[in-house]
Regions:
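Alpha-helix capping and helix-loop boundary segments enriched in small/acidic/polar residues
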Residues: 7-10, 34-38, 61-65, 84-87, ...
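N-terminal glycine-/serine-/threonine-rich beta1-alpha1-beta2 phosphate-ribose binding loop
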Residues: 1-56, 65-80
């Protein structure tokens, strides 16, 4: 990673095994958080309290209460904090949303969103020694301690409630955010969901198949369909919002 960045900017960046060291560096203005989900809110709050602005990878937090704490921290320390739903920054998407808000198709009241994939089974992990390159104590951070298993790092932590938030907040958050933006809504008044782990019998805990319905005060509705292990497309696309 360091070598790749050096080639892009012709300057070798500093590296530290612990992000908290960067918070003490006066030359650092912004912390970009791309850690596992359970670290998102704590890292963002620490950064704000250290006087740093934050670009925070989705999801904002591991649970709703942490998200509220992040918002309060940004306000308290007067820091700029942006959550990484990057489509908000795409000019073509912003232009389309502006057209939608201007009434190009009338008043929209329903948005359908989805994400599909063909993820493989993660198997049943075995407790093993922590790899020499991994500071597992720091990786676990604020989470209660659990033994290291060989099917956890780098990506499969997404599917464990202890560290991750499942496909809904791994990918669903992108499409639902676009739908909220397009419908010009904020918090839902009613949420319902059903789903489960159906495709494989393994250590994966979060749903691999899920439906979420969100209703809003202005009589509008958003649905999200997630299928982590069945990549059959919807509307000829593996991911989308209409």
């Amino acid at each position: 990673c360091i070598n790749a960045i050096e080639k892009i900017q012709n300057k070798r960046p500093k590296a530290t095994p612990d992000f908290r060291n960067a918070l003490e560096d006066k030359d650092v203005d912004v912390l970009i958080v791309t850690a596992p989900d359970h670290w998102h809110a704590p890292a963002a709050i620490l950064a704000c309290s250290a006087g740093k602005h934050v670009y925070l990878e989705k999801p904002c937090s591991h649970n709703p209460n942490e998200g509220e704490l992040v918002v309060k921290a940004a306000a308290k320390y007067k820091r700029i904090l942006q959550m990484g739903n990057q489509r908000r920054s795409w000019p073509n998407v912003a232009a389309a949303i502006a057209e939608l808000h201007a009434g190009v198709i009338g008043k929209p009241y329903y948005a359908k969103t989805w994400y599909t994939n063909n993820r493989a089974s993660i198997g049943v992990g075995k407790e093993t020694a922590v790899p020499s390159w991994l500071n597992y104590d720091l990786w676990q951070g604020p989470a209660p301690r659990k033994a290291f298993k060989d099917n956890l790092i780098h990506y499969n932590w997404h599917w464990f409630w202890h560290w991750g938030t499942g496909e809904a907040l791994n990918n669903g958050t992108h499409m639902v955010d676009l739908a909220r933006w397009g419908l010009d809504v904020h918090y839902p008044t009613k949420v319902s969901s059903n789903g489960g782990r159906y495709r494989y019998q393994d250590d994966w805990e979060t749903p691999d198949t899920q439906m979420i319905n969100l209703e809003f005060e202005n009589k509008s509705l958003i649905t999200w369909e997630g299928r982590s292990c069945n990549g059959k497309s919807v509307e000829s696309q593996s991911v989308g919002v209409i």
